[in-house]
């Protein structure tokens, strides 16, 4: 179980057929009830590093996890598999934000522009094992992540 509320609730909302971005309080309450039920039915581990270690070592049989972390775990344990639930998933990309109170906005913008240069974005994506929003990275056939369905699913959810 994810130790951040946004991702944990997204799982419950998908199971209930709700929109991940629902603003309806009753949707959130129903999702909270469903999450509370899992405590009695499973042996939940909430610290993601612990889940990572238990999955990578083969001690746990399955877990909900981030695609990029799965890709890293699979490099160390080829017996691991990955699937998307039929209820759906949220697509995640790391993002950069500049606070409105930033003292060096131009420097922050220059850094973001640098990180989105094709070669830099490719190296960053391969280092962290996560999808890049940069199309040149996703379509780069020389990338170690090219064709990795966990990181770049063929069929995008609606």
Model-flagged regions — what are they?
Residues 1-56:
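Extracytoplasmic ligand-binding site segments that recognize negatively charged/polar headgroups
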Residues 5-8, 68-71, 88-90, 103:
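Solvent-exposed loop/turn segments at secondary-structure junctions
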Residues 13-18, 36, 40, 56, ...:
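Sec-exported extracytoplasmic/periplasmic mature domains
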Residues 56, 62-79, 128:
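A ligand-binding cleft/hinge motif common to bilobed small-molecule-binding domains
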Residues 79-84, 88-93:
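Extended hydrophobic/aromatic segments used for targeting, binding, or gating
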Residues 1-2, 10, 44-45, 61-65, ...:
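Structural recognition of the beta-strand scaffold that forms the well-ordered cores
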Residues 51-54, 70, 108, 121:
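Short, hydrophobic alpha-helical packing/hinge segments within bilobed ligand-binding/sensory domains
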Residues 90, 94, 99-157:
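Mature extracytoplasmic/periplasmic domains
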């Amino acid at each position: 179980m994810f130790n951040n509320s946004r991702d944990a609730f997204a799982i419950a909302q998908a199971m209930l057929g709700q929109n991940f971005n629902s603003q309806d309080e009753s949707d959130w309450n129903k999702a909270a009830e469903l999450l509370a039920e899992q405590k009695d039915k499973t042996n939940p581990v909430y610290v993601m590093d612990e889940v990572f270690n238990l999955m990578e070592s083969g001690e746990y049989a399955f877990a909900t996890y981030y695609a990029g972390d799965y890709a890293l775990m699979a490099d160390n344990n080829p017996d691991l598999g990955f699937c998307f639930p039929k209820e759906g998933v949220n697509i995640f990309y790391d993002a950069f934000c500049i606070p409105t109170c930033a003292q060096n906005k131009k420097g922050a913008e220059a850094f973001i522009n640098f990180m989105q240069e094709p070669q830099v974005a490719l190296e960053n994506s391969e280092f962290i094992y996560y999808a890049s929003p940069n199309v040149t990275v996703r379509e780069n056939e020389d990338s170690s992540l090219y064709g990795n369905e966990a990181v770049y699913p063929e069929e995008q959810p609606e």
